[in-house]
């Protein structure tokens, strides 16, 4: 039995970054079709301006990055906190462009790695196109972003929210949501319960 799983992700989320390896491992271990989709967090819209946030908020932010770094360090990853709050629509739409041209895995790895090394501005269209070219995609991303790609990105964001998604990473199996990389264990249990074949022993 093959299971279809949707993974909603955002390149500027530290938790999505560290969950990437767990998602790849899930695909390696189970007979699943894992479809990555961009869910772009508009942080300023739901958390307010930076100036308006209280000390309690910043304590939570500091803890979140400390926690994500624990997982990143275990994977040998570099996770440097971003210098500003981004609305990463360009780099997120790049995911769709990479999928269209068969270079998703290369782009996915590069996009996460470069952002968390502070080596790319996810809002810079030219920088995202250069990343796509490096991954093996053809030129043409700016037009795609300005046209059908941007429309599809926004449609998917609405679709995600309509299905209950509120954060990343979120795995969806037959309508059931598993939010956070630390829920992958529960997702694995659900796959076993449903009789999804394993590609190899756990």
Language-model features, listed with the residues they occupy:
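Short amphipathic alpha-helical segments at helix-loop
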Residues: 8, 49-53, 141
């Amino acid at each position: 039995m093959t299971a279809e799983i949707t993974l909603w992700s955002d390149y500027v989320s530290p938790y999505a970054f560290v969950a990437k390896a767990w998602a790849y491992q899930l695909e390696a271990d189970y007979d699943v079709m894992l479809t990555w989709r961009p869910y772009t967090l508009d942080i300023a819209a739901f958390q307010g301006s930076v100036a308006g946030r209280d000390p309690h908020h910043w304590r939570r932010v500091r803890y979140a990055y400390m926690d994500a770094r624990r997982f990143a360090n275990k994977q040998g990853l570099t996770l440097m906190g971003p210098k500003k709050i981004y609305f990463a629509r360009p780099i997120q739409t790049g995911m769709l462009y990479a999928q269209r041209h068969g270079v998703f895995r290369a782009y996915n790895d590069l996009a996460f790695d470069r952002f968390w090394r502070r080596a790319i501005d996810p809002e810079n269209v030219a920088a995202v196109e250069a990343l796509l070219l490096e991954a093996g995609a053809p030129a043409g991303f700016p037009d795609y972003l300005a046209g059908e790609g941007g429309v599809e990105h926004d449609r998917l964001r609405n679709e995600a929210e309509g299905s209950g998604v509120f954060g990343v990473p979120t795995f969806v199996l037959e309508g059931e949501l598993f939010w956070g990389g630390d829920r992958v264990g529960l997702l694995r249990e659900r796959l076993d319960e449903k009789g999804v074949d394993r590609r190899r022993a756990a």
